[in-house]
Structure formats: structure tokens, C-alpha cells
Amino acid sequence: MTDLRLFTSESVTEGHPDKICDQISDSILDALLTQDPTSRAAVETLVTTGLVHVAGEVTTSGYVDIPQIVRDRIRDIGYDSSEVGFDGSNCGVTVSIGAQSPDIAQGVDRSYESRSGSASTDAHDLQGAGDQGLMFGYASRDTPVFMPLPIYLAHRLAERLAAVRHSGELAYLRPDGKTQVTIGYEGLVPRTVDTVVLSTQHGPQVSQEDLRREVEEHVIRPVLAAAAEIGIELDSRDATLLINPTGKFEIGGPKGDAGLTGRKIIVDTYGGFSRHGGGAFSGKDPSKVDRSAAYAMRWVAKNAVAAGLADRLEVQVAYAIGKAAPVGLYVETFGTAHVPEERIVRAIRETFDLRPAAIVERLDLLRPIYAQTAAYGHFGRELPDFTWEALDRVADLQSAAGL
């Protein structure tokens, strides 16, 4: 296998500065939705040495204690003392929250179709998209959960790194960390693990030699073994393992780098295997199609691949602000389609209602479910609340496509 093509994806742990911000923003959103499921929110967070700043726009009938939510989330991640470089109990928290612009609200609350007299009697025609934009969804047969293999493994490594820290198995680890996986592909088939890069914050008491040996033993090898157990066959015998390749990594988290909500959009999605419309997810309620339509596109793509319409499928949807119906739908199958692509597009249109209100209703998105999406990927984790991962439209798509 000398002609393998190498594809790489990365992930980060929950203690990475940008991911701290995503989790804070989504924790605030969850609290708002708990108080008022119709809350509109766009919450942005910045963290830096000793300070958290929360800003954005919120319209709600509820009340939430934002500083307390911030502190609780930071401590849960593991930043609970000055020794690790950040302390949720003592850091500064500033809040600058305003109301959603009425100019935006008017288009969401009363759609273009409603205002122009072209709306049907269907209530889903009455809510417009919260912004213009384009969103992508993707699925492939690389893994049992229909995710590309490089990002799947990168997430599992990051999750495992956090797990052995929280459990005390590797007690010297600290919250910040990054993972990266390079997979060798023969055509469209993943064959080898070429390189694993793992950088983890740690305390001063451990040598780099011990850290590298124990991270390989307790993190990398168990993740590769677990992948094999679910049928992912990879040759990792010649894999290059680069663990803390710069040496010591004691200063991390917000003390090492400032963090911002929405700066890990490729980590959040498909690891670069699919295109991205540019809109981040965290801190946004589901009236924002940046989030809800991206979730719907994952639902569409996963069901389409599971239905046998293609082995790899990317789907794009586009919206105009204030308009209920999408303005565009596009499918790319990278030469793997089992039926003509135009038939796939027709089947998707027949099977899925992609108006924003219909997406929110079908995927039950007005729930406080978002903090759990904010680390280790919004897609490919088949958790009970992740309705967009359900394979519940397979038969409908097969019927609509004539299979």
C-alpha cells in the first residue's frame, strides 16, 4: 500500500480555551431554554488570563445567573485552582448582554411568505430564517456512525484524555489538550493510522518520558483498540506517535491562550472532510439556521448514506433572512452515488421539510441540550438528545429514490 493518500483531522479537549467558551455559551443557552423555551439567544464568550467576558443578544422571559453559570462550567471542566492556571471560583466575570434587534425579530416572527401573502395555512410557513446563509451536512461509510474516520478518532482521543484526567488514572494531567490523527486512504477506504499527535497540559511532577509512555498506554492504545472492536480495521503498527512534541506543556488554558466562542468550527463538524458554511453553533438558539439547519443537514446526509443512496454524501442548504423556504439545495456524492444525484435531491425534498420551524419541531430543538454538544463534536455521537443522529428516514428515502 505505497500509494496511500493521507488525510488529517484534529480535535481539542474540553479544557482548550476556545472550547471553554463554546461550553459557557451553550450552558447559558441551556439555562435560558430551561426558563423559557422560546428564548432567542446569541451568546459569545471570551476567556483570557483570570477573566471571562460574556456578550451578545438575548430576548427571554426568564432570568439566569450568568456569572454563576460561568463559574460552575469552568470548575466542571477542571479549572478549579491557580495551580492549573485558571480558577472558576476566583476569575473575573463581566457580562454585556442586550436584546435581539427588532429588525431581525420581525423577519423570524413573521416570515417573508406571511408578509407577502404567499404563505400556506401551514404554521411552519410563518417563521422565517434567522439569517441568510449556507449550511452543509456530510456522512460517509468510514465508521459505523457514518463519520469520517480522522475526526472520529481525534474526538475519541480527546475524550479519553479528559476521562483519564477526571478519573485520576493520570492525575498529573491538566485540562488543556489537542489531538490530531492522520489516516492513510487507499482510494476511499481508510487503511492505516499514519500519525497521531497528542499534546496535553500537565503538572510539573511528571517527566516527559513517563508522560509519553503512560499517554500511549492509557489513551492512544485503548482508543485504537476500541475502534477495532466496532469493526474499524486499521493497520497502526507503523504509526508515528508524537506526544507533547514540543516538550513540557505546563502553562495552558486561558493563561496560555485567549479563547473565543466559535473558533473551532471544523472540530465541531467533519474535521475538514466536508465544506463549511462558516457559521458557528455554540450560544445560538435554534431559530438561527447556522445551527438548526446544519444539524438538519447532518440528519439528511446520514440517512441518505444509510439508505444506500451513496457511500459519501455532502448536502448544502441555503436560506434568505426572514424567508421560511430554503433558497437552495445541492448534493455532492464524490462519484459514490448508487442512483443519479438529481434523484437523490428529489428524494430529499420529498422526505425532509427544511423550513426552520419544521426543523425545530421535528428535531425537538427547543430543549436545554446544547452544553453536551459543545465539546467532542456535534455530530457522530449517538446520544439520546442528539435527534439529528437518528436513522429514522432511511425507508422513506429508499422509497422516494426508487430503491
From Swiss-Prot:
The reaction(s) this protein catalyses: L-methionine + ATP + H2O = S-adenosyl-L-methionine + phosphate + diphosphate
- Origin species, per record, is Clavibacter michiganensis subsp. michiganensis (strain NCPPB 382)
Q: Where is this region: Flexible loop?
A: 100-110
- What PROSITE patterns does the entry give? ADOMET_SYNTHASE_1, ADOMET_SYNTHASE_2
Which NCBIfam families has this protein been placed in?
Answer: metK (TIGR01034)
Family affiliation? Belongs to the AdoMet synthase family.
Q: How is the cofactor bound?
A: Binds 2 divalent ions per subunit.
The protein, known as: S-adenosylmethionine synthase
- Identify the residues that bind Mg(2+): D18
Report the InterPro entries cross-referenced here. ADOMET_SYNTHASE_CS (IPR022631), S-AdoMet_synt_C (IPR022630), S-AdoMet_synt_central (IPR022629), S-AdoMet_synt_N (IPR022628), S-AdoMet_synthetase (IPR002133), S-AdoMet_synthetase_sfam (IPR022636)
List positions binding L-methionine. E57, Q100, D257, K288
Which terms does the record give in the GO molecular function aspect?
ATP binding; magnesium ion binding; methionine adenosyltransferase activity
Specify where the region named Disordered lies, as residue ranges. Answer: 106-126
Q: What is its EC number?
A: 2.5.1.6
Q: Which cofactor does it need?
A: Mg(2+); K(+)
Tell me the function of this protein.
Catalyzes the formation of S-adenosylmethionine (AdoMet) from methionine and ATP. The overall synthetic reaction is composed of two sequential steps, AdoMet formation and the subsequent tripolyphosphate hydrolysis which occurs prior to release of AdoMet from the enzyme.
Q: Where does ATP bind?
A: H16, D176, G177, K178, K248, F249, D257, R263, K264, A280, K284
Q: Kindly state which keywords UniProt assigns to this record, in alphabetical order.
A: ATP-binding, Cytoplasm, Magnesium, Metal-binding, Nucleotide-binding, One-carbon metabolism, Potassium, Transferase
The EC class name is transferase
- Chain positions recorded as K(+) binding sites: E44
Subunit structure comment from the entry: Homotetramer; dimer of dimers.
Looking at the UniProt entry, the stretches that span the membrane are none
Alphabetized Gene3D superfamilies for the sequence: 3.30.300.10
Which pathway features in its UniProt record?
Amino-acid biosynthesis; S-adenosyl-L-methionine biosynthesis; S-adenosyl-L-methionine from L-methionine: step 1/1
